Amino acid sequence: CGADWMGFICYHRSPRYVESVPHFMPQRAMRVGVFVNAGREEILQKAEQMGLNMLQLHGNESPQLCRQLTDDGYAVIKAFSIKTPDDVKRTTDYEGTCRYFLFDTPCPGYGGSGKCFDWDILSEYKGDTPFLLSGGLKPTSLPALAAFSHPKWAGIDLNSGFETAPAQKDADALKSFIEQFKNLPL
């Protein structure tokens, strides 16, 4: 479908949880494991088993764990729920420990709210770590994405906005959206 990275939910409580990488996995796509409050050993074991390239951490993981996983050879993406400018400031302790930050919509539980947060808050982000924009992105989000600008914005994370049911992605909608997004003058 044209995605550069493909995420696999490694959080047992999620309806999107996967035990292993599908056999039809495109070879060029980076494999991203999504974890919530897992310990280092569990993450490393799953990363080895699934052949992961990147680790996305969506819980209350410490900067120390992010640093350890980076030192273990993985690109780490640390997610932050953004509601206020103070939420953006929480990234400070993680500077230098992650390849990317991911800014998402706060919701009960972890992930998949289908709602956007106020992207204007990200004008408060002055860090050096590039970030991914997430939370409520769907096919109708293209005009808002075209209007968004930030010097550290590196990409987007898509999930529930492209599902026909939990864990069932609409491949045609994803492909169309990704093609259009890649052609935006960002």
Whereabouts are the PLM-identified features?
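Conserved N-terminal beta1-alpha1 strand-loop-helix module at the mouth
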Residues: 1-186
